[in-house]
A protein has these predicted regions:
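Enzyme catalytic cores with a strong preference for nitrogen-chemistry domains
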Residues: 1-296, 312-313, 323, 348
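ATP/NTP-dependent adenylation/nucleotidyl-transfer catalytic domains that generate, transfer
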Residues: 2, 209, 235, 261-299, ...
Length: 551
C-alpha cells in the first residue's frame, strides 16, 4: 500500500477553502501513485473550531464539505480520509462529533468518531463534542486498518504511567485483528513534543508489531501552533517516512517496501521554537486578514527578537518599527533601535513621548498634590507608548505586536494598557533566558542585524533614572527556573526552594507575584504557545480567589 500523508494548513471555518486544499493535495498524491491519502483531524473545518460548532448550520455545512470533497476526488484512483465535524445520532447531549470519513469514487465508505475527548491544557473538546462509543475496522482487501483520531491513540496503557482514560482504543482495534494504524492528529507544538510523538508511537509499534501512520496538522490557529512533523513507522518502530516541520508537505510511503520520503529539519529545539513563532505570527496575520505589523522598538532584546521574527513572518516591507524615547530613555537605546531597523531593512519612526508625558504630569499635578512620584509616573510613560502604537495602528491598518516575554508577564512586570497593548503577543510564552537564545538564532538568519550591545546591556524598562530589571526581580536565570517549576509543573514553593537550593522567601515572593497578576494576563493579547504550559487558553485560574500556597 502506498500511503500519502496530506500535511496541510487548514483555516478554521473556511470549509470551501479547506475542501479545495484537500482536493489539490489528493490530485498530487494520485499523480505520485498513492493508493490512499490521509489528512489530519478536523481538516475540513480546521482545528480547533471551538464554539463554531454551536452555530446553527455549521454541522450541516461540515457534512456537506465531506460530500463536496468526495465529489471532487471521485475520479481519482485513490481513497481519501479526512476529518470533519459530524452530527451525532444520539438524541441526548451534545450534537457535534469529531469524526473522520473514508471516501472513494465519490462515496463515503466509512465514518469513525473520536472516543476520547481531551479536556486539559489547550484542549476542551468535551465542551463541544459528544464522544463516540464504538469503533470499526476498515476492511481494505486483505488489510484490517485501524483508524483513530488524535487522542484515541494517545492513551497507550503501557506507555503512560497514569493513563487519563480507562479505554485504550488502539489496543482494542489491534486485539480485533488490525494490521495497520492510521492516526489523524491536530497535535500542537511545544518544546519536546516532536520527540514525545516519536517515542509514543514507537512504543505502540513495538508492542503491537504493526506499522504506524501519524499525520498531523500544520499551521497556526490563534494561540496554538501545529508543527506537522508527520511520519510513518514500520512494525519495528523505524521511521520510514517523515514530513517537514512547520510547513505543508505531501509525504508518500510504501508500507510493503518500507521506503518513503524522509525529511528532517529544525532538529535543534531552539531553531524549532523560533520557526514555530514565525509560523504562528504569519498565520495569525494571514488568517485574520492583516498584512502589516507595528512594533515598538526600545533598543532592548525583547523588541529585537519580535522584530526579526516579524520580518521572517511577513517580510521587511510589512514591518514598521517605532522608537518612542521618553524622559529616561538612554541615547544608546535609541541608537540601537535605529541601527537594528536599518540592518533589517525596516522603516523606523521616532515619536518622542516626553512632551506628552510632561503635559500629563502637569495636568495631574493638582490631583497628585502631596504625593511622591512612584510607579504611577512610570506607567504613564508605558501607556503613552501604547497610545502611540494603537493610534498608528488605527491610522495605517497595521497589527501591533507586543514584546513582553513570559518571565515578565508571569510576575506582572508589565503595564496594562501600556506595553501590553497590541493584537498578538509573539514571545509571551518565551522565558527571558530563552529570549537571548532565540535572538541568536534570529541574528544568525539576518546576518547580525541585532547589535551586540543589545545582547550585552542589562535589561531595563527605562522608566526611571538608572533603572534595571534586577532592581525589582531576581536574576532571570533564577526567576525562570522558579517559573518553570511553579507555572509549568505546578510544583509547591517549598519543593521548589529545596530543589533549586533557594531561600524559601524568594520563591514565595515569586509565586505570590504570579498568583496576584492573573488579572493582567487575562486582559493580555493572545500569545503563541511554545512551552508545555503557556498563559492563555491552556491555563485557567480564577482572578478573585484567596488560595495562595506561599502563605
Amino acid at each position: 500500500m502506498r500511503i500519502a500523508l496530506g500535511q496541510v494548513n487548514p483555516t478554521v471555518g473556511d470549509l470551501a477553502g479547506n475542501v479545495a486544499l484537500c482536493a489539490r493535495f489528493s490530485r498530487a498524491a494520485a499523480e505520485r501513485g498513492a493508493d490512499l491519502i490521509v489528512f489530519p483531524e478536523l481538516t475540513l473545518t480546521g482545528y480547533p473550531p471551538r464554539d463554531l460548532v454551536e452555530k446553527r448550520g455549521f454541522i450541516e455545512r461540515s457534512e456537506a464539505a465531506v460530500e463536496q470533497l468526495a465529489e471532487e476526488t471521485a475520479e481519482l484512483p485513490l481513497t481519501v480520509i479526512a476529518g470533519y465535524v459530524g452530527r451525532s445520532k444520539v438524541k441526548t447531549g451534545k450534537q457535534a462529533t469529531n469524526s473522520a470519513a473514508i471516501l472513494r469514487s465519490g462515496a463515503v465508505l466509512m465514518r469513525q468518531t473520536k472516543m476520547l475527548l481531551p479536556t486539559y491544557d489547550v484542549f476542551d473538546e468535551a465542551r463541544n463534542f459528544i464522544p463516540g462509543e464504538s469503533q470499526t475496522l476498515w476492511k481494505r482487501g486483505a488489510d484490517n486498518v485501524a483508524l483513530t483520531i488524535c487522542e484515541d491513540a494517545w492513551n497507550d496503557k503501557e506507555f503512560w504511567t497514569h493513563p487519563l482514560y480507562p479505554r485504550d482504543p488502539v489496543d482494542e482495534l489491534m486485539q480485533r485483528g488490525a494490521n495497520l494504524l492510521l492516526s489523524i492528529n491536530a497535535s500542537p507544538f511545544n518544546l519536546g513534543k516532536r520527540q514525545l510523538r516519536i517515542e509514543m508511537f514507537r512504543a505502540m509499534a513495538h508492542r503491537h508489531r504493526k506499522p504506524m501512520v501519524m499525520v498531523n496538522q500544520v499551521g497556526g490557529n490563534d494561540q496554538v501552533v501545529f508543527d506537522g512533523s508527520s511520519f510513518v513507522m514500520d512494525a519495528e518502530g523505524n521511521v520510514i517516512a517523515s514530513g517537514a516541520s512547520f510547513r505543508e508537505d505531501l509525504v508518500v510511503a510504501d508500507i510493503a517496501t518500507g521506503k518513503g520520503d524522509l525529511r528532517a529539519d529544525f532538529t535543534d529545539e531552539c531553531d524549532a521554537v523560533y520557526e514555530a513563532l514565525v509560523l504562528g505570527t504569519r498565520d495569525y496575520m494571514r488568517k485574520c486578514g492583516f498584512s502589516r505589523v507595528l512594533i515598538g522598538l526600545s533598543g532592548g532584546i525583547d523588541s529585537a527578537l519580535t522584530a526579526v521574527i516579524a520580518v521572517d513572518a511577513v517580510g521587511r516591507d510589512n514591518v514598521r518599527g517605532v522608537a518612542m524615547p521618553g524622559p529616561y530613555s538612554s541615547d544608546h537605546s535609541v541608537r540601537d533601535a535605529h541601527a537594528m531597523a536599518e540592518r533589517l531593512g525596516i522603516r523606523c519612526d521616532t515619536v518622542s513621548i516626553t512632551p506628552a508625558y510632561d503635559e500629563m504630569v502637569r495636568t495631574l499635578a493638582p490631583v497628585f498634590e502631596g504625593t511622591k512620584q512612584d510607579v504611577t509616573e512610570e506607567n504613564i510613560q508605558s501607556r503613552l507608548r501604547g497610545l502611540t502604537l494603537m493610534s498608528l495602528s488605527n491610522k495605517f491598518g497595521a497589527l501591533v505586536l507586543t514584546t513582553g516575554n513570559k518571565s515578565e508577564i508571569a510576575v506582572g512586570y508589565c503595564t496594562l494598557y501600556g506595553d501590553m497593548c497590541g493584537g498578538l503577543a509573539v514571545i509571551s510564552d518565551v522565558p527571558k533566558t530563552m529570549v537571548y537564545e532565540l535572538s541568536r538564532v534570529g541574528n544568525k538568519r539576518h546576518n547580525g542585524a541585532i547589535p551586540e550591545a543589545v545582547f550585552e546591556k542589562p535589561p531595563s524598562a527605562e522608566l526611571r533614572p538608572d533603572q534595571k530589571d534586577s532592581d525589582s526581580l531576581p536574576p532571570y536565570e533564577v526567576l525562570d527556573a522558579i517559573l518553570r517549576l511553579y507555572v509549568e509543573e505546578f510544583r509547591g514553593v517549598r519543593e521548589i526552594a529545596t530543589e533549586l537550593s533557594l531561600p524559601l522567601d524568594l520563591v514565595k515572593d515569586v509565586a505570590l507575584k504570579v498568583d496576584r497578576n492573573e488579572y493582567k494576563r487575562q486582559q493580555a493579547a493572545p500569545g503563541l504557545r511554545v512551552t508545555s504550559k503557556a498563559f492563555g487558553i491552556g491555563r485557567r485560574f480564577p482572578i478573585a480567589q484567596r488560595y495562595f500556597e506561599n502563605e
